A protein has these predicted regions:
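Cell-wall glycan-active module
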Residues: 3-154, 163, 206, 210-231, ...
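Alpha-helix capping and helix-loop boundary segments enriched in small/acidic/polar residues
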Residues: 163-171, 191-195, 199, 229, ...
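Non-membrane alpha-helical structural segments and their capping/turn regions in soluble enzymes
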Residues: 129, 194, 198-202, 232, ...
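Helix N-cap / loop-to-helix initiation motif
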Residues: 144-148, 186, 245
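Functional cleft and adjacent loop/helix regions within the main domain
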Residues: 239
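Substrate-binding/active-site groove segments that recognize
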Residues: 167-189, 199-212, 263-264
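Cell-wall polysaccharide-cleaving catalytic domain and substrate-binding groove, primarily
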Residues: 155-172, 179, 245
């Protein structure tokens, strides 16, 4: 599964945001939006992690600014204007500037410094709420926790109705053609059911039920962890399978090795590269958490 353009201007791989055929009416307001909640005691552990806090900042920052961040620790060293970043790129001064930040913060020359543009405009939460309401009905009917639909809809922004991934994934759930066809959707030159929200919700829910959750369960058991569909760490592992595919996540889990808890597994996955499980795959669950936390804050705001 190849979803979510992961937004780093420099060195960040990713794919385009999902399509959206939904247009909210003027009468709709966030007061009526449904939100599938994560238990606070489970969320608190991940809320404190620097990678999640970093993505929260990226989501809140407008595109006229950029964060200077140490890649491994997610230490946010500075916020600069997009104009300055553009000038650094144009005059090939980016690496020299990165080295200045390394020197100032005591990092080694080999450590990566990234420049990440703000993406507030990309995450349009007011378009997500009605979609979550509709998706919840479909996921409930199929017996899959609709929290997965909410995360996907939050991070596969509905803000670009005509975009598709370079790998051919299309729609609100960034479904690949073979996945869509497996669950009865038509994908042809004249018709693409991945544009149909109800049909694509059905396909995504069945994919979770038949493929993502069972594979995540087997991976957890391979590490001596008990799969629990109600635990946040397990749900995030499922999200990684949805995004990167079971084979790639399995390689990453094997590279992680022994862990004492599901939470430890997730933190190590965020720093593990194996096979095609790379930078964008690491970031997927971080961004899911960050967008969810920001969505909660947005729902509470005036």
């Amino acid at each position: 599964m190849n979803g979510l353009g992961l937004l780093l201007l420099i060195g960040f791989s990713g794919v385009a945001a999902c399509q959206s055929s939904y247009k909210p009416t003027a009468a709709e307001s966030k007061d009526s939006f449904h939100c599938i909640r994560v238990p606070a005691e489970q969320l608190d552990f991940f809320r404190k992690q620097p990678p999640v806090q970093f993505w929260q900042k990226v989501i809140l920052l407008t595109k006229d600014s950029a964060i200077v961040v140490h890649k491994d620790s997610r230490n946010m060293m500075d916020v600069i204007s997009a104009k300055r970043l553009d000038s650094l790129v144009n005059c090939s001064g980016l690496e020299k500037t990165a080295q200045c930040y390394r020197d100032s913060f005591g990092y080694e020359t080999c450590e990566l410094v990234k420049f990440v543009r703000g993406k507030r405009e990309f995450f349009d939460f007011k378009k997500v709420g009605p979609l979550v309401d509709d998706a919840k009905q479909v996921f409930d009917e199929i017996g899959v926790n609709p929290i997965y639909a909410q995360w996907i809809l939050l991070i596969e922004s509905p803000n670009n109705p005509r975009a598709r991934s370079v790998s051919g994934a299309v729609g609100h759930y960034q479904l690949m053609p073979f996945v869509a066809k497996k669950y009865g959707l038509v994908v042809s030159s004249g018709r693409d059911d991945r544009h149909d929200f109800q049909l694509s919700s059905m396909a995504a829910a069945k994919l979770m039920r038949d493929y993502c959750i069972p594979n995540a369960s087997r991976m957890a058991l391979s590490l001596g962890l008990q799969p629990d569909v109600d635990q946040l760490w397990f749900q995030l592992l499922v999200m990684h399978v949805y995004n990167a595919g079971a084979g790639n996540v399995r390689k990453a889990v094997a590279a992680v090795g022994e862990v004492q808890s599901g939470e430890e597994l997730l933190l190590k996955l965020w720093k593990t590269q194996a096979g095609a499980f790379g930078n964008s795959s690491q970031n997927y669950s971080q961004l899911a958490l960050a967008s969810y936390i920001n969505y909660l804050d947005w729902l509470k705001s005036e």
